[in-house]
Amino acid sequence: MVDKIMNSTANLLFDFAEVSVGQHYYWQIGEYSVHGQVLMTSWFVFAVIAILSIAGNRDLKAIPEGLQNLTEYITEFIRDLAKTQIGEEEYVKWIPFLGTLFLFIFVSNWSGALIPWHIFEIPNGELAAPTNDINTTVALALLTSTAYFYAGFSKKGLGYFKRYVSPAAFLLPINVLEDFTKPLSLSFRLFGNILADELVVGVLVALVPLVVPIPIMLLGLFTSGIQALVFATLAGAYIGESIEDHH
């Protein structure tokens, strides 16, 4: 009996530790193939954010209690972040965008660190945090690039393009290249950190499946939060840079 319990426990731990990279479960939607496992975990993240938002704000009180405290703290945190990075005149309209980015990335990262997605079986590949897929992080980075282009162009019109030859015309190639490196750095930084964290935890659980991986998992929670903050902060900084006046 003891041997059976030990074997079943070991099998469960190894199932948790199993890591498969580059394998995807595809859904066919019309002519397009999409990563089904990313959509499933993304819907879970959206549901968590929606449930917490509704639960925390359905019965607002003058003196906040419970989840209302949490939602107000998050709102103030994102508002201060936007104000710091974008400036007092323009920051208000960008709070929803930065807040959505931060919450989606934060909950996605923490879902990968806290939920043993690997034990849920799908026909191919495995479930993981949405930000563990390069397609998700690239999409978030391109969305950020679109946002700061829109911010600059909507405020300055064609004058926005003067930034490419400022302070000197010979800097044009460097400034153009910078617009390509920004989304690259955003996407690969987030993807690399989340993937590396899940791989390290998976390997440690396979090698030493008791208490040794726990500090790494706790560090992963901290890193996951930092990555969400870094992404949202850089997004705000890029938007602020695109709308500031160059002299």
Curated annotation (Swiss-Prot):
Record membrane topology: Multi-pass membrane protein
Keywords of the record: ATP synthesis, CF(0), Chloroplast, Hydrogen ion transport, Ion transport, Membrane, Plastid, Thylakoid, Transmembrane, Transmembrane helix, Transport
InterPro entries: ATP_syn_F0_a_bact/chloroplast, ATP_synth_F0_asu, ATP_synth_F0_asu_AS, F0_ATP_A_sf
Keyword Ion transport: yes
Transmembrane region(s): 36-56, 95-115, 134-154, 199-219, 220-240
GO cellular component terms, A-Z: chloroplast thylakoid membrane; plasma membrane; proton-transporting ATP synthase complex
A UniProt-annotated Pfam family: ATP-synt_A
Main subcellular location: plastid
Cell compartments where the protein resides: Plastid, Chloroplast thylakoid membrane
GO molecular function, one term: proton-transporting ATP synthase activity, rotational mechanism
Gene3D superfamilies the UniProt entry points to: ATP synthase, F0 complex, subunit A
Coiled-coil intervals: none
Family of the protein in this entry: Belongs to the ATPase A chain family.
Known partners and oligomeric status: F-type ATPases have 2 components, CF(1) - the catalytic core - and CF(0) - the membrane proton channel. CF(1) has five subunits: alpha(3), beta(3), gamma(1), delta(1), epsilon(1). CF(0) has four main subunits: a, b, b' and c.
Purpose: Key component of the proton channel; it plays a direct role in the translocation of protons across the membrane.
Annotated HAMAP family: ATP_synth_a_bact (MF_01393)
Protein name as it appears in the record: ATP synthase subunit a, chloroplastic
